[in-house]
Design a protein with these regions (language model features):
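Acidic, glycine- and Ser/Thr-rich low-complexity intrinsically disordered tracts
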Residues: 465-482, 491-493, 536-542, 669-674, ...
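Acidic Gly/Asp/Thr-rich repetitive segments characteristic of extracellular carbohydrate-active
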Residues: 216-245, 256
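Surface-exposed, short loops/turns at beta-strand junctions within beta-sandwich domains
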Residues: 91-95, 176-183
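Right-handed parallel beta-helix
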Residues: 260, 264-269, 289-300, 314-343, ...
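Extracellular beta-strand-rich solenoid/capping regions of secreted or surface-exposed proteins
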Residues: 228-233, 249-264, 272-319, 346-355, ...
Length: 718
């Protein structure tokens, strides 16, 4: 590996980066809206040049004909900082994809606006899609017109458009034709405005388990013995269906469902399996690896885990299952005996699901747990086998402690769930990296989340301190970087892990600030990332290596009666769009250094078309939407939030906009604030902030705070 001494590195990087560079743009963006470009080396008096891509074609021709550029037009920026440039798209700009470049003494490489930006794909079998199954694609600017199309391209170059396409700008879904040949394909997307190759998809035959039926009624009258015998027979057979006819069945032991086996009841309302109130419950009531459970109800009292799968599991399906898991059934409070029986000492014990395997689906279930309901939580460093590629959809969820703990995600579809805190101590919901290097690629959409009054009551939070390095670099060679000092690994384990593959290698400040890459390999001071930086770091750059929580899509959810929706402790490339909130603490990004274990900034977070209908609640403050930071000190006083965009949000009934802390290069545009003393709270530590075309109705002081004088404010036309 080629290494450079620090002095040589500085000279080489300076030579490479003399021209302007733009590495991120705030897509989607429309006419008369502001584009935020992140980059640097703008030079003196830079101008932006914009050119449209050719008009869209229909599939499949759109996938085989390259687009052409129209005429370049120049636009003068409205705000320039060392790391960002803002300009307004002319009101006459037609919708579409545009090539953008910055011209000063030199010309920057092109960056595209509104081009499809695929983040990840997922099939009905996790990383794969089955013939006749589905594939979904997630990201930015995906379905922008009626000409949107998905297609598969085989190794010979043949392109097959996919039918049954549905979607929006954040996700697109289509059916995989049953007539295709199994194999590896390129997934192609046309948004209607532009095209992109979205990744590799493996197409497989439908998964077929054996259908031999083992009727519980044929195995005796003792329910526990009959169940164990039927499961054993299915295991001996290599799988099958253990069928449970109408009835109530007391089960006194833990059950292990064999691989390839479906535990199927006659109906959710017709079949009940119930366990006694164990003084010492088993580790799990049901161990479910590579199997399915459907059409029945489970009742239990004291429990550790109701349904568990393990890291080796590669397929789990749970559909139309009702679960009532109340460890405090017929008790008044934790630790207080009643009628000679003792309840658990703590409210937080117990999990309905504890999943560590891959390719799981929990759909159309009715779930109530006195502790946690969804613990996608291996509670350890997973390495190359994490709880990845899941679907949790269409469920009714009630809980006593927490609805979900999501740790080490990579591809989770969490949608159309109704989630209610039930109990005075029902707390919040987390997406975490306590033990691991990442939680990424989450689609969290069309859920209703409500009634959380316990603990921190976060309606949704990213969480966990952790880090591997803060400091300078000694050398750069493409995607290989040499740290200037030894890394220091910190996480929640007694002995922190040292393999940081998948973590975020972030440029906090200095040259290239606001960029990040994903770690692919590390050993001592030698680190490799997934691709070179567009604007490489140099001796002036400050680096933070910390867990990657990002590429999350929070879309069209409703949050009521709870605490904050917060991108806490760092978020990268995160969309918060179309959500509604009432009687909550608001929606905001929050960059900081939890526990002093690692600096975790917020980069590229966009809050679009959200609404807070009621800004009052239990909190000492009114609700707000925006960004804040914390924990800055003499070691690092610089920005912990960059490229924050607030657009078309509505804040009502004592809710407001807020930028507080070390925020750099942010935008608030076309937002509306109604019925409040203050419309916008802006603090002096924020730099490079633009407020444009925001409107205020019945607001005493539209702009307030010690940062007003530093901000650029362009009032809305009257």
């Amino acid at each position: 590996m080629k290494l450079w001494l620090l002095a040589l590195c500085i000279v080489a990087v300076s030579a490479v980066c003399a021209a302007p560079v733009a590495f991120w743009a705030s897509s989607p963006v429309g006419p008369d809206e502001t584009v935020l470009l992140m980059g640097g080396n703008w030079g003196d008096n830079p101008v932006v040049e914009l050119a449209p891509l050719s008009a869209p074609l229909s599939a499949p021709a759109v996938f085989t004909r390259p687009p052409t550029l129209g005429q370049w037009k120049q636009i003068k920026p409205v705000q320039i900082t060392p790391n960002a440039l803002k300009f307004v798209l002319p009101v006459t700009t037609p919708p579409g994809v545009y090539a953008c470049r910055v011209r000063s003494a030199d010309l920057s490489p092109q960056i595209l606006l509104n081009a499809p930006d695929p983040w990840w794909l997922q099939g009905d079998e996790g990383k794969a899609a089955s013939l006749g199954g589905w594939v979904r694609l997630f990201g930015r600017c995906l379905d922008m017109s009626a000409d949107c199309a998905l297609a598969l391209r085989d190794p010979s170059g043949k392109v097959t458009p996919l039918p049954d396409l549905k979607g929006d700008q954040w996700n697109v879904r289509a059916t995989v034709p049953a007539s295709l040949a199994p194999g590896d394909y390129d997934l192609l997307l046309s948004s209607g405005w532009g095209t992109a190759t979205a990744g590799k998809l493996t197409v497989i035959p439908p998964v077929k388990w054996k259908t031999d039926v083992f009727n519980l009624a044929d195995f005796g009258t003792d329910p526990t013995a009959a169940m164990q015998a039927a499961l054993a027979k299915a295991a001996e057979n290599g799988g099958g269906v253990v069928y449970i006819p109408r009835g109530r069945y007391q089960i006194k032991e833990s059950l292990t469902i064999p691989p390839g086996t479906t535990l199927r009841g006659e109906g959710m309302a017709l079949v009940s399996l119930y366990w006694p109130d164990f003084e010492t419950p088993p580790d799990a009531l049901i161990v479910a690896n590579d199997c399915a459970i459907e059409n029945l109800t489970l009742y239990c009292q004291n429990h550790r885990v109701v349904i568990r799968n393990d890291p080796e599991s590669e397929r789990l399906r749970v559909n139309k299952v009702r679960i009532r898991a109340n460890a405090f059934f017929m008790f008044g409070e934790p630790g207080a005996p009643f009628r000679g029986k003792n309840p658990p000492p703590k409210m937080m014990d117990g999990h309905v699901f504890r999943l560590s395997g891959r390719n799981y689906q929990i759909t159309d279930c009715d779930l109530w747990g006195s502790g946690a309901v969804f613990s996608i939580d291996p509670h350890r460093f997973t390495g190359t086998k994490g709880p990845w590629h899941g679907v949790i959809s269409g469920n009714t969820v009630a809980y006593g402690s927490t609805s979900h703990v999501f740790e080490n995600l990579d591809g989770l579809i969490y949608e159309h769930n109704d989630v209610r805190g039930r109990g005075t101590s029902a707390g919040g919901n987390g997406i975490n990296t306590f033990w691991n290097n990442f939680s990424r690629n989450l689609y969290y959409a069309n859920n209703v989340i409500h009634d959380m009054y316990g603990l921190d009551r976060e309606m949704m939070t990213l969480d966990a301190g952790g880090g591997a390095y803060f400091g300078k670099i000694a050398a750069v060679d493409g995607n290989k970087l040499t740290l200037a000092a030894d890394p220091t690994y910190k996480d929640y384990a007694p002995t922190p892990h040292t393999d940081w593959s998948g973590a975020a290698f972030m440029i906090l400040d200095g040259t290239g600030a606001g960029q990040y890459r994903l770690v692919t390999r590390n050993e001592g001071r030698q680190w490799e990332v997934d691709k070179p930086f567009d604007l490489p770091p140099d001796a002036n750059s400050l680096i933070s290596i910390a867990p990657h929580r990002g590429r999350h899509l929070f879309v069209n959810n409703r949050f009521e009666d709870g605490g904050a929706f917060q991108l806490y402790g760092g978020a990268l490339d995160t969309i918060v769009a179309g959500n509604k909130g009432a009687r909550m603490d608001g929606f905001f990004a929050w960059g900081l250094n939890p526990h002093d274990w690692g600096w975790q900034p917020c980069f590229n977070c966009q809050f679009l078309d959200n609404e807070i209908t009621e800004g009052n609640g239990y909190s000492y403050r009114s609700a707000f939407l925006g960004a804040v930071t914390g924990n800055n000190n003499e070691l690092y006083p610089g920005p912990l939030a960059r490229a924050i965009v607030l657009r078309r949000n509505v804040l009502q009934s004592n809710a407001r906009l807020r930028f507080g802390g070390t925020i750099s290069d942010a935008l608030a545009e076309n937002c509306i604030v109604k019925n409040n003393e203050i419309g916008v709270d802006i603090r002096a530590a924020a730099n490079g902030v633009l407020f444009r075309n925001n409107k205020f109705e019945n607001v005493t002081t539209p702009y307030s705070g010690d940062g007003v004088e530093k901000a650029m404010i362009i009032p809305a036309p009257k």
